[in-house]
Amino acid sequence: MFPTLTVRENLIATAANRAGRPQPWTQDRIYWLFPRLAERARQYAGTLSGGEPQMLAIGRALMTNPKLLILDEATEGLAPVVRGEIWRCIEALKAQGQSILLIDKNMRALKRLADYHYILEKGRTVWSGDAAALERDATTIQRYIGI
């Protein structure tokens, strides 16, 4: 994010449709997904607060029209209300068919959103499967997730 550019300028700066998608991400679509950004379109990115910088970061990533959106702890350190907003947006992206790689510790959200789960330890896959298989595997949950 460029702090001396406005929200709008930050979105324009990353806009690209290299894959030639028929419905590329536009500012309007980003503003639909994150209405707060529409309210702050003319505001400098460096003055955003709460979860707004994270929303802008996701919006900027979407403006590149990625085949795979990678989100690494996208809600870490955010207030619960803002976290919920971002999870709802991720849900909407999934419903629209966006491929997403989520890295997070929030198992409740991951179970709801992920089609498939991987547990990594020191860079190696130690478990993989769907949410139902994970819920049945008490040993894995206890050892790696700590629930």
Give the label of every model feature segment:
Residues 44-48:
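Conserved ABC ATPase signature
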Residues 61-62:
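ABC ATPase C-loop
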Residues 65:
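Conserved catalytic motifs of ABC-family nucleotide-binding domains
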Residues 84-96:
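Helical segment within the ABC ATPase nucleotide-binding domain
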Residues 110-112:
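A short, surface-exposed alpha-helical micro-motif characterized by mixed small hydrophobic
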Residues 69-73:
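Catalytic Walker B motif of ABC-type/P-loop ATPase nucleotide-binding domains
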Residues 7-25, 33-38, 129, 147:
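ABC-type ATPase nucleotide-binding domains, specifically the catalytic core motifs of the NBD
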